[in-house]
């Protein structure tokens, strides 16, 4: 062993007595690869592991807890220890956990013992994960102990299902064949947990449903009980699909209970869908659900219907999202049909039955239970959209029309009841999240925009409405007025002081969670980028974004990222009115800055643009060479190099800039007209000098402007232009014919000599 690490013999001396900081430091040092040497097995490593095994056999809970952590770290980072002592550690951990859980439910458990049991379960789970996948270790250390570990975990699941069920779920998926003898005990455990399902925490409920779904992996594929169907091909997901249909078949009887309260027959489409739901199918693997008791004389029992539908939805979600070793066939049509039926159960369009009494307790229970029933349809669609995605495109019209049924409406009206929206805040936010999920597959063309527009108004109202104190104010003042003078003091003594409601009403407001802002901002981003919203909704989103961005900046000192993204979207997609909030957005983000706003405020063209250059012809190359030589002439040369008929003054900087322009700018060919080509052929000197004409409007300036000479043939061959750097040319007036006393046709030739007008400078 190297001298840079502490010898294991030193740890052995302080292993039982160390605690606190010493123990944490020892754990960190044991992760060093310096201890992963096979030479240490003969002396130090064997002595150290013997001490760890002694800690795990101890009757002291704290010593067992320390042994669990040392075994976890040492086996994770030291493969030598895992291969040498993995099987022995598995046996000791199993026996320690069995002793700790044998009388776990009968005796009073202290917090210290619960922590020790939790450490034993976590260590056993980690050790099995480390051994799994290694052929020799799995065969020698893991498989022999599974037959004893599985029943022990199932028995412990009755006391601590949140600890044992995650391990059982993993064993079901990884060792389904080894688990087959214990399926009956696990099914009995899950049936007991289903009996008090609503008393479990959400995480445990999710694990219970996942474990029930994985039970279908233990059945042998291709085991067809019907001998007449034995010749058909069997699929690997046959039992998985049967379990899913077994759960779907239980929706029908529960939904039909609402048929005793609501007049479902008034909606022919809903009644037809309800009749086509899957019927009850026998499945021996699925755990049994307890009987559902509903008494209309006890209106509160109507909530049991929503609770059972929530449990069934959790079970269906497990079948959809859990990974399997084989592809699964999901019945999309049946799942969409179930969600559509659940969302259609609303008093907005379905009246109560005529023979039903209308007392406040019954109607109130019905109106509170129906939204929870609809919410399960939203959850089911959300799960399908997240895990199946674009396969739902063919069902989108039915899905969108069903989603709109969840929005509460006023009685016998089509306007939104915003007061009910406050009570259904959680469900409406889940509806918005569902819209965000399916919008990724909808695209930009949506025929019906009513749902999108309604959600914009509802989200803005939910976020802005904190708590309704107006009713408290009105009821307090009305009660005080009703009380007489003598009774007013007695009323105040009973009710207490109500002055804080009037003097500090903001102290009674509940803050909106940031998760709600995230859902709303995501929906607004999606709506602005995908669809053209009306001006009213566009202005409402803009006002909401500016107000809360400024509010968060003042209270928290920063603007959340979702609001920054919404500001960018509003600037880039201004809507139909085309008004821009760019100055306001830049002011809000002036401290942190934003790359999008920086580009909009300071646009910059890309440098060294790459274009296509065409190889010039021989005549064009000679012309370009002569022009380059002319522009590259030194500044101290006489003006004799210029034409005698025209005096052009060129500054030194102009010539230098012209040469640099020829080197850096992208050259493009200039096509000349037939007349210019003829003139250049006959009078090359005159053609070269005529391109340099002094600009009278810019005399005295140091630099001349660079322009491109265009011809009528530019449109024919635009990619093959060439660019020359020349001085700016002013329009030349039309030439006045000179009368030389000879007729114009004396020459008899077809060529016409151009007439040159001398400038005033030449005359002088």
UniProtKB/Swiss-Prot annotation:
Composition bias, Polar residues: 670-680
The record's keywords, sorted A to Z, are: Nucleus, Ribosome biogenesis, rRNA processing
Q: Where in the cell is it found?
A: Nucleus
Q: Which GO terms describe its molecular function?
A: chromatin binding
Query: Which segments show compositional bias classed as Low complexity?
Result: 725-738
The terms describing its cellular component in GO are: cytosol; nucleoplasm; nucleus; rixosome complex
Which is a GO BP term held by this UniProt record?
Answer: ribosomal large subunit assembly
Q: This protein's superkingdom?
A: Eukaryota
Pfam families, sorted: RIX1
Q: Is the keyword rRNA processing in the record? A: yes
**Region Disordered, residue ranges:** 611-648, 670-764
**Segments of skewed composition (Acidic residues):** 619-643, 741-764
The entry sums up its family as follows: Belongs to the RIX1/PELP1 family.
Q: How does it assemble?
A: Component of the RIX1 complex, composed of IPI1, RIX1/IPI2 and IPI3 in a 1:2:2 stoichiometry. The complex interacts (via RIX1) with MDN1 (via its hexameric AAA ATPase ring) and the pre-60S ribosome particles.
Q: What does this protein do?
A: Component of the RIX1 complex required for processing of ITS2 sequences from 35S pre-rRNA and the nucleoplasmic transit of the pre-60S ribosomal subunits. Regulates pre-60S association of the critical remodeling factor MDN1.
Q: What is this protein called?
A: Pre-rRNA-processing protein RIX1
Q: Which organism is it from?
A: Eremothecium gossypii (strain ATCC 10895 / CBS 109.51 / FGSC 9923 / NRRL Y-1056)
In the UniProt record, the gene name given for this protein reads RIX1
């Amino acid at each position: 062993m190297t001298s840079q690490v502490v010898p294991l013999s030193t740890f052995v001396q302080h292993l039982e007595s160390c605690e606190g900081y010493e123990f944490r430091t020892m754990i960190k040092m044991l992760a060093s690869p310096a201890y992963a040497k096979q030479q240490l097995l003969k002396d130090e490593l064997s002595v150290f592991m013997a001490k760890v095994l002694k800690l795990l056999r101890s009757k002291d809970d704290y010593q067992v807890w320390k042994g669990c952590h040392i075994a976890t770290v040492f086996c994770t980072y030291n493969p030598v220890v895992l291969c040498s002592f993995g099987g022995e550690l598995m046996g000791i951990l199993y026996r320690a956990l069995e002793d700790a859980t044998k009388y776990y439910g009968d005796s009073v458990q202290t917090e210290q013992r619960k922590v020790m049991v939790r450490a034993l379960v976590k260590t056993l789970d980690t050790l099995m994960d480390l051994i799994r996948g290694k052929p020799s270790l799995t065969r020698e250390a893991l498989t022999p102990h599974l037959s004893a570990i599985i029943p022990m975990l199932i028995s412990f699941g009755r006391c601590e299902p949140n600890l044992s069920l995650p391990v059982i779920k993993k064993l079901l998926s990884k060792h389904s064949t080894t688990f087959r003898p214990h399926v009956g005990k696990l099914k009995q455990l899950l049936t007991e947990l289903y009996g008090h399902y609503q008393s479990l925490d959400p995480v445990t409920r999710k694990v219970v449903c996942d474990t029930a779904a994985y039970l279908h992996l233990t059945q042998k594929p291709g085991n067809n009980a019907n001998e007449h169907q034995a010749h058909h091909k069997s699929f690997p997901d046959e039992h998985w699909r049967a379990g899913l249909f077994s759960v779907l078949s239980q929706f029908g009887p529960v939904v039909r209970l609402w048929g005793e309260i609501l007049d479902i027959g008034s909606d022919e489409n809903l009644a037809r869908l309800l009749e086509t739901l899957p019927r009850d199918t026998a499945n021996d693997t699925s755990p049994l659900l307890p009987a559902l008791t509903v008494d209309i004389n006890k209106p509160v029992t109507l909530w049991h219907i929503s609770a059972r539908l929530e449990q069934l939805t959790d079970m269906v979600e497990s079948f959809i999202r859990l990974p399997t070793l084989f592809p699964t066939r999901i019945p999309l049509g049946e799942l969409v049909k179930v969600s559509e039926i659940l969302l259609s159960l609303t008093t907005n369009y379905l009246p109560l039955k005529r023979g039903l009494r209308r007392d406040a307790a019954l109607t109130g229970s019905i109106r509170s239970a129906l939204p929870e029933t609809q919410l399960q349809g939203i959850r089911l669609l959300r799960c399908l959209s997240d895990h199946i995605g674009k396969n739902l495109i063919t069902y989108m019209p039915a899905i969108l029309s069903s989603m709109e049924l969840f929005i509460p409406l006023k009685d016998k009206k089509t306007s939104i009841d915003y007061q009910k929206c406050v009570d259904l805040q959680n469900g409406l936010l889940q509806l918005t999240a569902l819209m965000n999920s399916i919008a990724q597959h909808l695209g930009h063309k949506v025929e019906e925009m009513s749902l999108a527009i309604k959600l914009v108004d509802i989200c803005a109202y939910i976020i802005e409405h904190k708590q309704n104190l107006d009713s408290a104010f009105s009821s307090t003042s009305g009660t005080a007025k009703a009380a007489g003078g003598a009774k007013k003091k007695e009323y105040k003594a009973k009710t207490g002081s109500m002055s804080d409601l009037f003097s500090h009403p903001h102290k009674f407001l509940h803050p909106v969670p940031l998760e709600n802002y995230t859902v709303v901002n995501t929906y607004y981003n999606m709506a602005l980028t995908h669809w053209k919203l009306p001006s009213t909704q566009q202005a409402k989103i803009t006002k909401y974004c500016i107000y809360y961005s400024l509010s968060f900046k003042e209270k928290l000192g920063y603007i959340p990222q979702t609001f920054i993204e919404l500001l960018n979207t509003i600037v880039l997609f201004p809507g139909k009115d085309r008004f821009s909030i760019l100055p306001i957005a830049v002011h809000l983000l002036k401290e942190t800055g934003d790359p999008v706003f920086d580009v909009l405020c300071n646009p910059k063209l890309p440098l060294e643009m790459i274009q296509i250059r065409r190889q010039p012809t021989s005549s064009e190359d000679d012309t370009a060479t002569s022009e380059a030589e002319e522009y590259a002439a030194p500044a101290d040369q006489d003006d004799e190099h210029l034409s005698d008929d025209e005096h052009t003054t060129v500054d030194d900087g102009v010539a230098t800039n012209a040469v640099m322009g020829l080197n850096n700018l992208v050259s493009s060919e200039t096509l000349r007209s037939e007349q210019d080509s003829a003139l250049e052929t006959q009078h090359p000197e005159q053609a070269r000098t005529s391109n340099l004409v002094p600009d009278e409007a810019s005399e005295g300036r140091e630099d001349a402007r660079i322009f491109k000479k265009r011809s009528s043939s530019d449109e024919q061959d635009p990619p093959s232009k060439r660019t020359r750097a020349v001085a700016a040319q002013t329009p030349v007036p039309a030439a006045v014919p000179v009368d030389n006393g000879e007729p114009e046709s004396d020459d008899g030739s077809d060529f016409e000599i151009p007439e040159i007008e001398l400038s005033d400078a030449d005359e002088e």
